[in-house]
Amino acid sequence: MLDWNPALYLRFANERTRPAAELLARVPLAQARHVVDLGCGPGNSTELLAQRYAGATITGIDNSQAMLATARQHLPEARFTLADIASWTPAPGESAPDLIYANASLQWVGEHETLIPRLFAQLAPGGVLAIQMPDNRQEATHRVMREIASLPKFAAYIGDAAKVRADILPIRSYYDLLAGPQEQAGVEAGAVDVWHTVYQHPMDSAGAIVQWLRGTGLKPFVEGLPEALQADFLTEYENRVDAAYGVRADGRRLLAFPRLFIVAQRKP
């Protein structure tokens, strides 16, 4: 199982936290008693939740011990639990969450057709499911990863690393999953808000883009390679990124980063 490097992830903390804040800004809950940060990472999103819902029980869920260790140091007042999102449910005796907040995490989990309705059904009546997912698998950053991974010198080691991250569904499918009839009796959406944004991040260089991706998307491609081949992969990747992202008027590169946002509220 992959583990993550919190320090590498947080090199671009402002850029990573911005969509988390914009997702939270659209959550229509003035108060909450129990908030779950599903895929909390190093706690940058959890901090936003704790600031907005002071006094609430905040539970962070992640499958990375390294990320959880950083989150616990940063927010000792919150609860953090090692768990797999694919099978997570509230602990026995725990109150149903008023907010399940999943920022940049569900793209690593498959079978959204069943996952999303299951998470929605875990909410307390009137509760909110808030999701943000990168939608960049067809961007040059990710196409280039797969192209290089298919080269013979890398393919034997990388295998199916391109499948580690789930394909997200068409936007309308998420709307239908939440706005339509639910399997569990008594679970019905009162409102579903879905939108798509393409961020344009100014990056200092092609190397900076590579460093961003090393914190997330590149990891399953590079981690299984011998050390010498890791360097070869990253060199080839940077060369192709350099060719794909032209220099702008100020000498920087614009990194296009599409993201999908979903906010769905259960009827009381």
From Swiss-Prot:
InterPro entries: Methyltransf_25 (IPR041698), SAM-dependent_MTases_sf (IPR029063), Trans-aconitate_MeTrfase (IPR023506), Trans_acon_MeTrfase_C (IPR023149). Pfam families: Methyltransf_25 (PF13649). It catalyses: trans-aconitate + S-adenosyl-L-methionine = (E)-3-(methoxycarbonyl)pent-2-enedioate + S-adenosyl-L-homocysteine. It is found in: Cytoplasm. Its EC number is 2.1.1.144. The keyword S-adenosyl-L-methionine applies. GO terms for molecular function: trans-aconitate 2-methyltransferase activity. It is an enzyme of class 2 (transferase). Disulfide bonds: none annotated. Keywords: Cytoplasm, Methyltransferase, S-adenosyl-L-methionine, Transferase. Gene3D superfamilies: S-adenosyl-L-methionine-dependent methyltransferases (1.10.150.290), Vaccinia Virus protein VP39 (3.40.50.150). CDD domains: AdoMet_MTases. GO terms for cellular component: cytoplasm. GO terms for biological process: methylation. Coiled coil: none annotated. Belongs to the methyltransferase superfamily. Tam family. Catalyzes the S-adenosylmethionine monomethyl esterification of trans-aconitate. This is Trans-aconitate 2-methyltransferase. The gene is tam.
